[in-house]
């Protein structure tokens, strides 16, 4: 729960001086990106902005405290303040913030600005006490906020110092409105107004001016002088002389003498006890101070001018002026040291009664009460964990003695899940092993099963599927039906293990079961994970259309539950990119891969390896080797600076080896082949992929025999495990092996198998990347006119893609080529004596590329009858009677010119 007072603008108090000159300056705040109010404590920053905000509706207010350095807490309150300003317009951001479903503050702010694009009237967001922020991530995120905020939004920041928000740049661009301590200092006229409404007997204007000068217009000093003058008989000027030259850091003695020593003992204790509360209401005051009429007491303290201010329009929430509050907390530690733990315990109990466990934990920690802290955690820790209050939980668990954790194994489990969420896998097992060693009878029963479920998740994350399977099965055997979270975890792990082992049908069933349980219990990240796994399994089985439909369900879940910022979102858009690439929808595949990189923009660059490999695949399919090389440089740098799952390494190696194949870089392939891992098995798609990489490198090096052994074994495994997409890929690589080895009939046989299987998978780009060798074989098959209709159509589509994205074959017959051809000593005499026109050379190139008459007409944008005329003329000039003879003639010319066809 969010504390309402932190989101409430302070109420404009009676007897305050209206700062007309400053309000006039602030009236143009909507013309600036940032309004910055800076001064030391006590200059009236908050009072000024509360006066300016009075009557404004489209304004959000966020009062900071020390706890707001936690990113998740900062995000929750800031978005809540924006919701306040827009009357609930930013619903998606609110859900994302509440459920912690965002990758970073910047990505959350980006979503906020998308929602605000539809809001056209002026908006204001006030952040008070920004000097309390010390987290550099928040500073950087707020710089992003200011750079990208909509033109109609003005950020108003109140701070005791100059915040790290790129102020200089804003100042240069005239996007900054500044009010500093010199402007905030009271003028003589404002000081006179102040004393006139605070003192029963007015003072002369000259006296008021002298007092104002003595304290340099410092508002807090003027307030202290007025308070002292009311409580004592000495003059205001005498108090002013005492305060002259004193600043906020030297006020303690003065406040003791002039404030605390001039109130009765009951009021003194009330001030000291209540000061431990960052915000307070009637119930908190009753419990912490023991006074029955807390609201009345707070209003009385406010009337006495003891630096207490209302935090909301209802008047229910109060807080002390920061300067006075800090002073009181320090005095409380000195004067009430013995009582302080009990005071904090009372505060914790009251916060708990009002439903604010995080505030209660703050006081339980301050009280040093391990038992209270334990009880709060036992009741609320998992809720805080699910809301990503990880820093607070970690601090709390560290404060508990080990014996307390052993007495409450669920807290050990919580600590282990915290470690798991931070990828500290080794520490998880160490912690659980130690707990099991020391807790009696823990090695059986429900808690042991929950330990095993977590251990199983750690094992699969750490690349140990056999151990993960053993632990997941043990957990499922021992977990009661009602322990849904651990059952979801164990079922998901078991499904992933079966996926790794190639048992795709069983794995798919378990992932569908995981999805059903996760949806039933609102465990959305596991629901998303299970859908992603289902899609991968269906892709491996060759059911790409069903995989697509499963991905659509996952995208729908992301939209409904606002999971866009989860790292798993990148996984989904990446496998969508892989599917689009397979279908030769390269522009969409590239856009999807880039969106995956955007999701991971706040993470380490190593996390982007997979999407980067996908971008390289797109470049390779287009034949854009320059771009591929540039991206490969970055990929190889990432490979050398990180530790990756075998699946990631396999995908990275794939694009490297294909690039070497396309560029004929045998040295790089040979060096890689000497050092790359040779997996023991090939029973899943990523192990198949790595062995395929090895075979491709061997083919490039002319090592046909070992490559054939590898590919035949891969095919045997793929057929037995029904890894149909891998079988399709393997057949294509085997085709290249046979073609290069001169075994043309074998090459044609496996190519026909690959084309037939592609009717199921829909593969296009897997054929395209094999380039001219594939194009030549497809041209021959098309000319034979013996392919079934579906295979014929696919072959023509693949050929068009090769011609579009790779070097156009008719480009061999451009003007430069024709000139060199005609000057070649071996050119046929018929070509010399009856030269073709440039258009006829282009038509010959397209015939050689396998284009039909209609396709040639479309390519050259002329009528089909015109193409027939060109074909008749070139046949006559070449001395050929039919299309196949023209193809053979073109092939001879290309070979003569040194082209490897």
Swiss-Prot record:
A single BP term in Gene Ontology: positive regulation of DNA-templated transcription
Regulation of this protein's activity per its record: Activated by ATP and maltotriose, which are both required for DNA binding.
TM spans (from-to): none
DNA-binding feature ranges: 853-872
Source domain of life: Bacteria
Family annotation (Gene3D superfamilies): P-loop containing nucleotide triphosphate hydrolases, Tetratricopeptide repeat domain, Winged helix-like DNA-binding domain superfamily/Winged helix DNA-binding domain
Keywords, in A-Z order: Activator, ATP-binding, Carbohydrate metabolism, DNA-binding, Nucleotide-binding, Transcription, Transcription regulation
InterPro entries named among the record's database cross-references: P-loop_NTPase (IPR027417), Sig_transdc_resp-reg_C-effctor (IPR016032), TPR-like_helical_dom_sf (IPR011990), TPR_MalT (IPR041617), Tscrpt_reg_HTH_MalT (IPR023768), Tscrpt_reg_LuxR_C (IPR000792), WH-like_DNA-bd_sf (IPR036388)
CDD domains assigned to the protein according to its UniProt record, in alphabetical order: LuxR_C_like
The UniProt record lists the keyword Oxidoreductase: no
HTH luxR-type domain location: 829-894
Leader sequence segment: none
PANTHER family, per the entry: DNA-BINDING TRANSCRIPTIONAL ACTIVATOR DEVR_DOSR (PTHR44688:SF16)
Family label: Belongs to the MalT family.
Record's subunit section: Monomer in solution. Oligomerizes to an active state in the presence of the positive effectors ATP and maltotriose.
Function: Positively regulates the transcription of the maltose regulon whose gene products are responsible for uptake and catabolism of malto-oligosaccharides. Specifically binds to the promoter region of its target genes, recognizing a short DNA motif called the MalT box.
Protein name, per record: HTH-type transcriptional regulator MalT
